[in-house]
């Protein structure tokens, strides 16, 4: 599985700011979108382009345009919504496919509760966004769902990943690509990433 830890200075700086324990909801939300935007830039670097001729201000001009499959952004509810605008900033025409999954706090297993996917998933590149890759359960369940709908090109964008989650994701779906702003140390006994960001969903939405 292709794993890319984006080490650009801006990404490292912004993730560092997100780790502050007393960060405000407004600031955390802004940074989640900003880092999501930077991850999108990295994840789309291999998109193919084609040269087309358009009518410019002074006559015909050749320009490059992205070709191939169209994109669908797949936020995993609810926290994934915090990264979605960062993706749409670069790909405003992308379709939005929503997957609702929560983690059972007792078993740490993913529990699906909602889905609304683009009707032509087999023709699209899916960019899944979720702030945390902890155990990997929610991400694996989401990819299972997308593949059942015919999607064959999938990239996952996360703010922070745990080694345990990366290992689980690779075992389940070695054909996907993972882009993360940071690979952290480990999970604690409750399945939270250390040092992590805390509960990203609570911090993005300001609710518990």
UniProtKB/Swiss-Prot annotation:
It comes from the Bacteria. Binds 1 Mg(2+) ion per subunit. The magnesium is bound as Mg-PRPP. Uracil binds at residues 193, 198-200. InterPro entries: PRibTrfase_dom, PRTase-like, Upp_B, UPRTase/APRTase, Ura_phspho_trans. One of its GO terms (molecular function) is uracil phosphoribosyltransferase activity. Pathway: Pyrimidine metabolism; UMP biosynthesis via salvage pathway; UMP from uracil: step 1/1. It is an enzyme of class 2 (transferase). SUPFAM superfamilies: PRTase-like. Pfam families: UPRTase. It catalyses: UMP + diphosphate = 5-phospho-alpha-D-ribose 1-diphosphate + uracil. Its cofactor is Mg(2+). Keywords: Allosteric enzyme, Glycosyltransferase, GTP-binding, Magnesium, Nucleotide-binding, Transferase. Its EC number is 2.4.2.9. GO terms for biological process: UMP salvage; uracil salvage. Allosterically activated by GTP. Catalyzes the conversion of uracil and 5-phospho-alpha-D-ribose 1-diphosphate (PRPP) to UMP and diphosphate. Belongs to the UPRTase family. This is Uracil phosphoribosyltransferase. It comes from Shewanella sp. (strain ANA-3).
């Amino acid at each position: 599985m292709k794993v890319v830890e984006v080490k650009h200075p801006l990404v490292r700086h912004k993730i560092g700011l997100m780790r502050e324990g007393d960060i405000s909801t407004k600031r955390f939300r802004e940074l989640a979108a900003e880092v999501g935007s930077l991850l999108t830039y990295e994840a789309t670097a291999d998109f193919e382009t084609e040269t087309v001729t358009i009518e410019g201000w002074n006559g015909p001009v050749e320009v490059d345009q992205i070709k191939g499959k169209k994109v669908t952004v797949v936020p995993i509810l609810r926290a994934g919504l915090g990264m979605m605008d960062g993706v749409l900033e670069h790909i405003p025409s992308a379709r939005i496919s929503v997957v609702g999954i929560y983690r059972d706090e007792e078993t740490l297993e993913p529990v699906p509760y909602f889905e609304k996917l683009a009707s032509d998933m087999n023709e699209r590149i899916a960019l899944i966004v979720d702030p945390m890759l902890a155990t990997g359960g929610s991400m694996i369940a989401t990819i299972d769902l997308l593949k059942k709908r015919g999607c064959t090109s999938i990239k996952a964008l996360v703010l922070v990943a745990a080694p345990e989650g990366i290992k689980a994701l690779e075992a389940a779906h070695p054909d996907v690509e993972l882009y993360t702003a940071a690979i952290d140390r480990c999970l604690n006994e409750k399945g939270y990433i250390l040092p992590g960001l805390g509960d990203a969903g609570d911090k993005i939405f300001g609710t518990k």
